[in-house]
Structures are given as structure tokens and as C-alpha cells.
């Protein structure tokens, strides 16, 4: 039986490129090499594409993907050279220039099927402010928030925040993930400092009401038919689940399935599917919720390319539902091919 080529794109230009490498290494080990051969391309911080490795069987435990330390800029290729007939691309890229619709548009221009959400849903879901506004219309509950756009009146934005929200608040770049650039503010001085920090990553800033809540996550898989997982809970040993805690210090554990009432579980799964459809989602996503002591549910964000390491919540949620990591990859390839065929048919 001939194998299908699975092209892994990893690295990227965003601050989340290190997470991308970890995710891609997990994917390359989980692939069913009876069905696929894998070709990998590293995207450097400057945006160059470099062909790195090929795998026809499961790599050894000590084999790592090539990164900035092991590739040479002279090996850069034209981005369009990744094209291969009958291949499917898995863009294991996080953050701006990865899951914001940019790479998705590029792959559609090349007429390459790819894993994950399309251009529109990727770009909308990447922007936390746009996501908030769309989900408001869809009737999905969220915490109160204000917005600051660089160039607007900062004093007016601070005053609005002080009027509408109470401390603590969380200040977030609108277009970053993995908690990059996010900080907690306990007073006006910290609020201003947090805005300054967030502006280093984006010109659009979201300021959210802090809530005392459990963090519960639901996995999503599908195109027109949307499947969801039982929720899992992030159990933290730190006050704020930031980038350092998530990927460097390993100060979190996960409770799968989450210990929540059946009615809460059912409602979260319904909200996750509703949000996914409202944003035009396809392929996959992870929906993150807050659950307060009084039982209030708030959708925090919808992540269209969740972390894919072997210890990440998304694959673990599906494994709890009986779908192995390897089978998740197969299903995502099928869904990506299905969306490609649909896009092509709509052009006729």
C-alpha cells in the first residue's frame, strides 16, 4: 500500500515557535508510519522555509527536529517548493503567522489540503476581540471586558476599565496565544504596565474581568459534523497559568475527565460546539472555559491549533474518549482533505 505524504510545518515567526517545535516532535512520533511518510519544514523567525528531515518510520527517542541551532540559512527554499501532489500539510504552528489565517491562505493558494481551520475562522479566532464580539451575538457567555487599540485615547480606555471592571483584571494582546504577553493587574498602576507589555506583542489589547474560577477545556473535532470531548480541568500549582508555567516549569496537572456535574459537562460541550460553528470552524479546536463556584460558565477562548505535545490537553482529551493520538492525526488528515475537496468544488 502506498503511503500518503504528511508535510509538517513547524517553528514560525511568532513568540510561540518553541511550543510549535515541541508539538511537531510529538506529532512526528505519533504518526502511523504504515499510512504516512513525513516530510518536515522549519520556518525560521525571519520567515524562511528550510527543508529539514524525512521520516518513513517512527524516529528514535533521541532524534530531534532541526531548529535555529541546527539549520543553515543557506538551505532556505522557496516557500512554494513545499508543494507535493497528493500530500496533506499539518501546519503545527502557533500564534501570529501560524494560526491567524496567513499560512492557511498560502496553502490554499498552492492548492494543498491542510489540517485545521480555514482562513476566515483562523483569523477571527486568533483575534480575541473579534472572537468576543462574534460570540456575544451567538449568545455564548463570556466575562466582562474592555478594549484598547493603540493610537486611541489611553486615558479614556483606562477610565472605562475602572468604571466597568473591578480588579484584578487580565490584560492580553488580542492576537497571541499560549499566554504570551498576558499579565494580571491588581491596581491602576499595574494595569498601565500590563498594557505597555501587551503592546509589545500587538496593537489591539483586550482587558478582561478576572474571576475566581476553575479552568475547564473541551476538545472539538469535525467539519459539518462537530464532535466534542468530555471536559478536562487544568489543575495549577501557580496563581496564573502563564507561558512559563505551561511549557517550561511544568507546574500544572490535568484532571480528565473534569470533576463537574453532568449538566455542567453537557452545557460546556454545547457551548463549545456553538462557538466553533459561530466562528466557522473546521478540523479542530480546543475551547477553554471558566467555571465559578456558583456554577457560572464563561467561555475564555477558542484555540484553533491547540498544543499538540504528548502532555497537551487536546490529545489527552481525545484519548479519554477512546481516540488515540495516532488516530487523531488520521482523522485530522481526512477532515483536511474533505475541506479541500469542498473548497475546490465551490470554485466550479
Swiss-Prot record:
Localization (cell): Cytoplasm
Signal peptide: none
Alphabetized PROSITE patterns for the sequence: ATP_GRASP, DALA_DALA_LIGASE_1, DALA_DALA_LIGASE_2
A single cellular component GO annotation: cytosol
Domain ATP-grasp: 132-334
Coiled-coil ranges (or none): none
GO molecular function term, any single one: metal ion binding
Cofactor(s) in the UniProt record: Mg(2+); Mn(2+)
Catalytic activity: 2 D-alanine + ATP = D-alanyl-D-alanine + ADP + phosphate + H(+)
Residue positions binding ATP: 162-217
Binding residues for Mg(2+) 1: 288, 301
One Gene Ontology biological process: cell wall organization
Manner of cofactor binding, per the entry note: Binds 2 magnesium or manganese ions per subunit.
Enzyme class of the recorded protein, top EC level: ligase
Binding site for Mg(2+) 2: 301, 303
Record flagged with keyword Manganese: yes
Enzyme Commission code: 6.3.2.4
Keywords of the record: ATP-binding, Cell shape, Cell wall biogenesis/degradation, Cytoplasm, Ligase, Magnesium, Manganese, Metal-binding, Nucleotide-binding, Peptidoglycan synthesis
Pathway: Cell wall biogenesis; peptidoglycan biosynthesis
Listed PANTHER family: D-ALANINE--D-ALANINE LIGASE, D-ALANINE--D-ALANINE LIGASE A
Family: Belongs to the D-alanine--D-alanine ligase family.
Function: Cell wall formation.
Name recorded for this polypeptide: D-alanine--D-alanine ligase
Organism, as annotated: Streptococcus thermophilus (strain CNRZ 1066)
Gene it is expressed from: ddl
Amino acid at each position: 500500500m502506498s503511503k500518503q505524504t504528511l508535510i509538517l510545518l513547524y517553528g514560525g515567526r511568532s513568540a510561540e515557535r518553541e511550543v510549535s517545535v515541541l508539538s511537531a516532535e510529538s506529532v512526528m512520533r505519533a504518526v502511523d508510519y504504515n499510512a504516512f511518510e513525513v516530510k518536515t519544514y522549519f520556518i525560521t523567525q525571519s520567515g524562511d522555509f528550510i527543508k529539514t528531515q524525512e521520516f518513513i518510520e517512527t524516529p528514535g527517542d533521541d532524534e530531534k527536529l532541526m531548529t535555529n541551532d541546527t539549520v543553515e540559512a543557506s538551505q532556505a527554499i522557496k516557500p512554494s517548493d513545499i508543494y507535493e501532489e497528493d500530500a496533506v500539510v499539518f501546519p503545527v504552528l502557533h500564534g501570529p503567522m501560524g494560526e491567524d489565517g496567513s499560512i492557511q491562505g498560502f496553502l490554499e493558494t498552492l492548492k494543498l489540503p491542510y489540517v485545521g481551520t480555514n482562513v476566515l475562522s483562523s483569523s477571527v479566532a486568533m483575534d480575541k476581540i473579534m472572537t468576543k464580539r462574534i460570540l456575544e451575538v451567538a449568545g455564548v457567555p463570556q466575562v466582562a471586558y474592555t478594549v484598547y487599540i493603540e493610537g486611541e485615547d489611553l486615558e479614556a480606555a483606562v477610565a472605562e476599565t475602572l468604571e466597568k471592571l473591578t480588579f484584578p483584571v487580565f490584560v492580553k494582546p488580542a492576537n497571541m496565544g499560549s499566554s504570551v504577553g498576558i499579565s494580571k493587574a491588581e491596581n491602576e498602576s499595574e494595569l498601565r504596565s500590563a498594557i505597555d507589555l501587551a503592546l509589545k506583542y500587538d496593537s489591539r489589547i483586550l482587558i478582561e474581568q478576572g474571576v475566581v474560577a476553575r479552568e475547564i477545556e473541551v476538545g472539538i473535532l469535525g467539519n459539518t459534523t462537530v464532535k466534542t470531548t468530555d471536559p478536562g480541568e487544568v489543575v495549577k500549582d501557580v496563581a496564573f497559568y502563564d507561558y512559563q508555567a505551561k511549557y517550561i516549569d511544568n507546574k500544572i496537572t490535568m484532571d480528565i475527565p473534569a470533576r463537574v456535574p453532568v449538566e455542567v459537562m453537557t452545557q460546556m460541550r454545547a457551548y463549545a460546539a456553538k462557538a466553533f460553528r459561530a466562528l466557522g470552524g473546521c478540523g479542530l479546536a480546543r475551547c477553554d472555559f471558566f467555571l465559578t463556584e456558583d456554577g457560572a460558565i464563561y467561555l475564555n477562548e477558542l484555540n484553533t491549533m491547540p498544543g499538540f505535545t504528548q502532555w497537551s490537553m487536546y490529545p489527552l482529551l481525545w484519548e479519554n474518549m477512546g481516540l488515540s493520538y495516532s488516530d487523531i492525526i488520521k482523522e485530522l488528515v481526512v477532515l483536511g482533505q474533505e475541506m479541500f475537496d469542498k473548497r475546490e468544488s465551490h470554485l466550479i
